[in-house]
UniProtKB/Swiss-Prot annotation:
GO cellular component, one term: cytosol
Protein name: Ribose-5-phosphate isomerase A
Cross-referenced InterPro entries: NagB/RpiA_transferase-like, Ribose5P_isomerase_typA_subgr, Ribose5P_isomerase_type_A
List of residues binding substrate: 27-30, 86-89, 100-103, 127
Similarity comment text for this entry: Belongs to the ribose 5-phosphate isomerase family.
Length: 228
């Protein structure tokens, strides 16, 4: 799958990213390859005057490692970004709906994505599903003091929710925004309706279902790169 990620990252950048753009940069393993290729194009001079807006501390680290400067102060923005480039955990091609958030950064990923003219998704073939929730749970970022209330609400809806535990240390995963993450097992019949419904719960900061109005998907399938 690593080769597929490299191929789609290079294709997407070659076909969509132009000099003088304001870019949102997502989080995840596929984005790692996008950053590496962006670095090559910047150093060669084929891409110039790009401004980068990041979605996580991990992405900031990767950009710094490639000596790519990024913007830390979002308050300077007074218009939408040109493109947000990101990966996905699951993709429903027919509706261009996504699950994101297994990397724990979906709140800022959605802030960047929904304030960009285009959301450009790059993915290998394992991310394509016929129904959201087939392989992955739905990540929900929750205020720490609200986690008990939210878990009770989800149980009343007969949904199985698990508090995400950090692999590197004892205790729950804490996001860059100092919140917890609940992973909810459910098959999503109506992605747009589900996204809107869960955002009504006090204490839920963001749900990892994405329905951007202008999503472009570059993915690998059947031994070739495809677009949707």
């Amino acid at each position: 799958m690593e080769n597929q990620k490299i191929l789609v990252a290079k294709y997407a950048i070659d076909h969509y990213i132009k000099s003088n753009m304001n870019l949102g940069i997502g989080t995840g393993t596929t984005i790692y390859y996008a950053i590496k290729y962006l670095s090559e194009k910047i150093k060669s001079g084929s891409l110039k005057n790009l401004k980068f807006y990041t979605t996580s501390s991990d992405t900031k680290y990767l950009l710094s490692k490639e000596q790519i400067p990024y913007e830390s102060n979002f308050s300077k923005l007074n218009k939408n970004l040109d493109i947000a480039i990101d990966g996905a955990d699951e993709i429903l091609l027919e509706k261009k709906s996504l699950i994101k958030g297994m990397g724990g950064a979906h709140l800022m990923e959605k802030v960047i994505a929904y304030n960009s003219e285009t959301l450009l998704i790059i993915a290998d073939e394992t991310k394509i599903v016929k129904k959201l929730g087939t392989k992955m749970p739905i990540p929900i970022e929750v205020a720490q003091n609200a986690v008990g209330f939210i878990m009770t609400r989800l149980e009343e809806m007969n949904l199985e929710a698990t508090l995400r535990i950090c692999k590197e240390k004892k205790g729950p995963t804490i996001t860059d925004n100092n919140n917890y993450i609940l992973d909810v097992k459910m098959h999503v019949e109506n992605p747009e309706g589900t996204e809107k419904y869960f955002k009504l719960f006090p204490g839920i900061l963001e749900i990892g279902i994405f329905n951007h109005k202008n999503t472009r998907i570059v993915y690998y399938q059947d031994k070739q790169i495809k677009e949707a």
